[in-house]
């Protein structure tokens, strides 16, 4: 089973699917979306990561209890549990690394407004704040201290030119349509609106795709 197989399975909100499968589908979707989007996406607030972390902890304890048992049947079950455990751990690590890479690259940007700070988890916000403070102190001790006071800010916007480096929202992304909809896209020469049906895969600027992804009309792939 590959990523597309997981994403094509039944809707994760369906009550007919076990909660473990729904969480795995949701985590996989978040992982794919975070790696595909050029900017940091909203941190999930539905308790998904708390449930996944609790499940990982339970599975680790189960593996520790089963380790050392020489029964072949138990050993086979142990292999299955370890394989599932590694899948969850890989998705979690890769998802968090993708987010940290974006925070490291555009720290000031994500600290520049409350709306952007709300995208971060409490741990990420603490990390970004401390990271930026350490970086600023390093710059001060290295060279900024020799500059005039008015030139020491790293977020200066004088002359309507911002020093804050921001993500490129016009980066091209691939999206899969989740319902029939007319898709508006910005082009270099002209803008265009095209009809799209459920299941279509499109390449489009993130600035045009973001709203559709946010409201559930499409998903990143």
UniProtKB/Swiss-Prot annotation:
Subcellular location: Nucleus
Keywords from the named record: Chromosome partition, DNA replication, Nucleus
Domain of life: Eukaryota
Biological process annotations from GO: chromosome segregation; DNA-templated DNA replication; double-strand break repair via break-induced replication
CDD domains linked: GINS_A_Sld5, GINS_B_Sld5
One GO cellular component term noted in the UniProt record for this chain: GINS complex
Main localisation: nucleus
Pfam families noted in UniProt: Sld5 (PF05916), SLD5_C (PF16922)
Subunit structure, as described in the record: Component of the GINS complex which is a heterotetramer of SLD5, PSF1, PSF2 and PSF3.
Family, as annotated: Belongs to the GINS4/SLD5 family.
Function as written in the Swiss-Prot or TrEMBL entry: The GINS complex plays an essential role in the initiation of DNA replication. Has a role in chromosome segregation.
Protein name as catalogued: DNA replication complex GINS protein SLD5
């Amino acid at each position: 089973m590959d990523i597309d197989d997981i994403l094509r399975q039944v809707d994760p909100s369906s009550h007919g699917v076990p909660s473990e499968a729904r969480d795995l589908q949701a985590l996989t979707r978040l992982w794919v979306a975070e790696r595909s989007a050029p900017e940091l996406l909203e941190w999930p607030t539905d308790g998904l990561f708390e449930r996944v972390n609790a499940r990982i902890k339970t599975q680790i304890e189960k593996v520790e209890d089963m380790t050392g048992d020489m029964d072949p049947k138990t050993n086979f079950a142990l292999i299955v549990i370890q394989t599932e455990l590694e899948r969850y751990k890989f998705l979690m690590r890769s998802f968090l690394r993708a987010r940290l890479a974006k925070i490291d690259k555009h720290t000031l940007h994500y600290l520049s407004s409350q709306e952007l700070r709300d995208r971060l988890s409490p741990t990420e916000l603490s990390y970004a704040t401390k990271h930026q403070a350490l970086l600023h102190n390093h710059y001060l001790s290295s060279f900024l201290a020799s500059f005039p006071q008015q030139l020491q800010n790293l977020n200066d916007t004088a002359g309507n030119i911002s020093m804050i480096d921001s993500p490129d929202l016009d980066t091209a992304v691939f999206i899969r349509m989740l319902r029939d909809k007319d898709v508006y896209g910005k082009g270099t020469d002209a803008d265009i609106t095209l009809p799209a049906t459920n299941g279509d895969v499109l390449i489009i600027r993130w600035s045009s795709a973001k709203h559709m992804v946010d409201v559930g009309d499409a998903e990143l792939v």
